[in-house]
């Protein structure tokens, strides 16, 4: 199975850290859409349009704000479960099977939300644009 990654850099505890996001497969992406579907129509009405198309980034924030605490936790756990942090010895999973694999993020809500937002935007960008994903894999295995 091919895995597609995207790297992002975040400041965690005063240190720049590189995170590797694994793109959601088609089934997980569809589940993500199913989770968010009830909030999309309202967000789409409020989002600004660029060249007649709604920008995905403008949709995600209002959807995040509308999610119930349980839905937000489910979304974050999915995104963090598809994320690794680059350490000196190699990549370490951020979360595995609902447990923190890299506990430095456990109390860093801002970084966890940013990772979740980046993951959602990247995984859904092709859906709203009407074409396939525009992201190019930085690394595939």
Task: Put a short name on every predicted segment.
Residues 1-11:
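Short acidic, Pro/Gly- and aromatic-enriched capping/linker segments at domain boundaries
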Residues 21-25:
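Short, proline-centered helix/strand-breaking motifs
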Residues 26-141:
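Short, surface-exposed, charged amphipathic helix/loop patches that serve as local interaction elements
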């Amino acid at each position: 199975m091919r895995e597609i990654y995207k790297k992002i850099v975040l400041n965690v505890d005063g240190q720049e850290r590189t995170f590797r996001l694994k793109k959601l497969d088609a089934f997980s992406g569809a589940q993500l859409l199913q989770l968010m579907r009830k909030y999309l129509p309202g967000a789409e009405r409020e989002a600004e349009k660029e060249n007649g198309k709604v920008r995905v980034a403008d949709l995600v924030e209002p959807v995040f704000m509308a999610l119930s605490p349980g839905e937000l936790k489910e979304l974050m756990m999915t995104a963090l479960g598809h994320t690794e942090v680059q350490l000196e010895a190699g990549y370490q999973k951020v979360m595995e099977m609902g447990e923190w694999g890299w506990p430095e993020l456990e109390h860093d809500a801002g970084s966890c939300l940013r990772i979740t937002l980046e993951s959602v935007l990247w995984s859904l960008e092709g859906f709203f644009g009407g074409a396939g994903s525009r992201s190019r894999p930085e690394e595939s295995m």
